[in-house]
A protein has these predicted regions:
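Repeated loop/turn-to-beta-strand initiation elements of outer-membrane beta-barrel proteins
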Residues: 74-76, 112-115, 170-175, 203-208, ...
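Outer-membrane beta-barrel "beta-signal"
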Residues: 303, 325-337
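Transmembrane beta-strands of outer-membrane beta-barrel pores
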Residues: 36-42, 61, 82-86, 121-123, ...
Length: 337
């Protein structure tokens, strides 16, 4: 009991020191995005389905965030974000997701950069969405669909991770690193490691990203040991168009090794109050002496009704080896708050 008294006294003093004005500065901010679309959706080898879908252009989510000014340019910050399936009124991308699936971290930010602990996006995910014209669209972006539709293992966010993002360390140059420990996840051992670099010079942006995955959500191939992914990306803005390009290599070491080579080219051009978006991605998968191919093309128009609300229409064609081709036609609305 004697050991508890000093701790209780310290806690009481801390609460007394936290004035209403100080607590007001730490008040959390509520924010998010709601996206819904309707249309005919199809995947290779399957029939077309007429549906109303959530999160095709951007995954819907709700988040809270806040920070505490510690003085001397140092801040403590946190964020908690959950995906929302608006069409079902349910949390998560799927029923198997934990509640705070999108982000859950706490960390420090200062002149040295930003360091966070918890669950946060990987450098590979960040670079992939930056260097294609349809951004983070899991429903319509050829690049996102080819990388994260089954090729890259370990999810777009890592649990139990330590992540660091630098400020601008040289003219136009920034970098990020992330790693996590497996912490006994079933069927996997070891840690995940990811690094990324970003360079900006006028109309040019370029990135290089590498990650090595040894744990995360499954399923995992038999005899899985690790997977390595390397990606280069770039964009260049002209007066009337922004051009995008990506090239990547994914190698999965398991009982049967798989090597995938991925390419993406795209463009975004302002037309009226919106943007015409076009992207093509090509993937070659090699398993032993067998090769298969995946080709995805998307064309869309994104029209902004305001800074917070846009409407869009997209057509997409996908062709996979040995499967019938698929065509998707959809239109939707997206609102940020």
């Amino acid at each position: 009991m004697k050991r508890l008294v000093p701790n209780a006294a310290i806690a009481a003093l801390a609460c007394a020191a936290a004035s209403p004005s100080a607590l007001a500065q730490m008040a959390p901010t509520l924010y998010g995005l709601v996206d819904m679309s309707v249309g005919n959706f199809q995947t290779p080898g399957n029939d077309s389905l007429r549906r109303a879908e959530s999160g095709r252009m951007s995954l819907s989510y709700v988040g809270i965030r806040g920070s505490d000014d510690l003085g001397g340019g140092l801040r403590a910050r946190y964020a908690l974000e959950t995906y929302i399936r608006v069409d079902e009124g349910a949390a998560g991308r799927t029923g198997g997701d934990p509640f705070w699936t999108r982000t859950a971290y706490v960390g420090l930010q200062g002149a040295f950069g930003t360091s966070v602990l918890g669950r946060s996006p990987t450098p590979l995910w960040t670079a992939t969405r930056m260097f294609n014209p349809l951004g983070d669209s899991v429903g319509f972006s050829p690049s996102i669909r080819q990388y994260f539709g089954g090729t890259v293992l370990g999810d777009t966010r890592w649990n139990n991770s330590v992540a660091f993002s630098s400020p601008e360390v040289e003219k136009g140059f920034m970098y990020s690193v992330q790693f996590n420990a497996g912490e006994g996840n079933p069927g996997t051992t070891g840690k995940n490691t990811g690094v990324g670099a970003l360079y900006t010079s006028g109309p040019l942006q370029a990135s290089g990203t590498w990650q090595r995955v040894r744990n995360g959500p499954g399923p995992w191939p038999a005899g899985f040991d690790h997977q390595s992914t390397f990606q280069l990306g770039a964009s260049y803005e002209l007066s009337f168009i922004r051009l995008y390009g990506q090239v990547g290599r994914v190698k999965t070491n398991a009982d049967v090794d798989v090597r995938s080579t991925l390419y993406q080219v795209g463009a975004a051009s302002p037309i009226g109050l919106g943007f015409l978006l076009a992207s093509y991605a090509h993937a070659k998968d090699e398993v032993a002496s067998t090769r298969s191919y995946r080709r995805t093309f998307s064309l869309g128009y994104d029209y902004f009704l305001s800074k917070a609300t846009d409407i869009y229409a997209v057509v997409m064609n996908e062709r996979f080896t040995a499967l019938s081709s698929a065509n998707t036609v959809a239109a939707g609305v997206r609102l940020r708050f």
